[in-house]
Amino acid sequence: RQLPPEAPELFARTLLGDAQARRGAVALVDDYLARKPVPIDGIVVLVLFRSGDIPRGLALLQEAPTANESLVLGNGIWADGREIRTAPEFAEFTRRSGLAAWWDVNGPPDLCRKAENGDYVCE
């Protein structure tokens, strides 16, 4: 259930914006996810985010923890993740992942606020 040996280089090139690598990385991710690994390697979610498939990345992330939450949350959502935080699917992600409930008790991060409808809206 591990990623194949070519994954690190392909994923790194994808994260750096290589369009050709992105196509290969997405195909590799599709194959990897078809095997239903548990837990999912966190880099897979990050690659989906950087490949523009934010809804799919958030859906995977909200269903179960990855093997590396700090990578996905730190680098994916908070560091350079404005397009992820502002995606329409982000509010559902915060609810289903438990972040919204945690923020209700502890307060949201600086980039987020609770909207009138109860959803968290982030910049």
Predicted feature residues:
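Alpha-helical protein-protein interaction modules
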Residues: 1-123
